[in-house]
């Protein structure tokens, strides 16, 4: 059965993230290898992985895109959807770089997806799909939140309602 996973803020290749986020690694290479190993240990080839932004780092957009290709080739999962974060490559006008977004099955700053078999009081006895709103940034409100939808975010976690934890 196909499973759905969420992860955010991997910051592959971002040396400073080790200090900024107190990540317990001696080097960014060790960090990146551990994250890829953890993803591959939990997420199967046909599962779906939603990445909630800040995928990887590069000194230039070209280096970042080339590095992203290299990383995606190491991840076993073939269904990776990206919700854009503030460190994902963009053009001077703020639009996502075309070569970058092509690497993912879908790519958007905001996604509304339906997650099957998510439990809620209203779902007992039913196999419904729950509306789930995904954004890199914590949203104070989101589409359908008063009707039982859930929100998931990366960067700025907070207790604003029913938020999904992201991470493997």
Predicted regions mapped to residue ranges:
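Conserved beta-sheet core of the metallophosphoesterase superfamily
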Residues: 98-168
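Core catalytic region of metal-dependent phosphoesterases/phosphodiesterases
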Residues: 2-7, 12-117
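A structure-centric signal for secondary-structure junctions around beta-strands
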Residues: 1-2, 129
């Amino acid at each position: 059965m196909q499973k759905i996973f969420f992860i955010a803020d991997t910051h592959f290749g971002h040396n400073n993230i080790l200090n900024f986020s107190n990540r317990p690694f001696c080097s960014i290479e060790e960090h990146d290898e551990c994250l890829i190993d953890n993803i591959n240990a939990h997420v199967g080839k046909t599962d779906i992985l939603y990445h909630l932004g800040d995928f990887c780092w590069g000194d230039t957009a070209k280096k970042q895109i080339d590095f992203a290709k290299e990383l995606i080739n190491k991840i076993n999962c073939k269904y990776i959807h990206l919700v854009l974060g503030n460190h994902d490559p963009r053009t001077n006008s703020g639009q996502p770089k075309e070569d970058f977004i092509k690497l993912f099955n879908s790519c958007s700053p905001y996604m509304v997806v339906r997650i099957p078999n998510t439990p809620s009081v209203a779902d007992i006895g039913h196999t419904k799909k729950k509306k789930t709103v995904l954004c890199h940034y914590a949203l104070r409100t989101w589409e359908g939140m008063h009707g039982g939808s859930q929100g998931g975010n990366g960067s700025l976690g907070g207790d604003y309602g029913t938020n999904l934890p992201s991470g493997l």
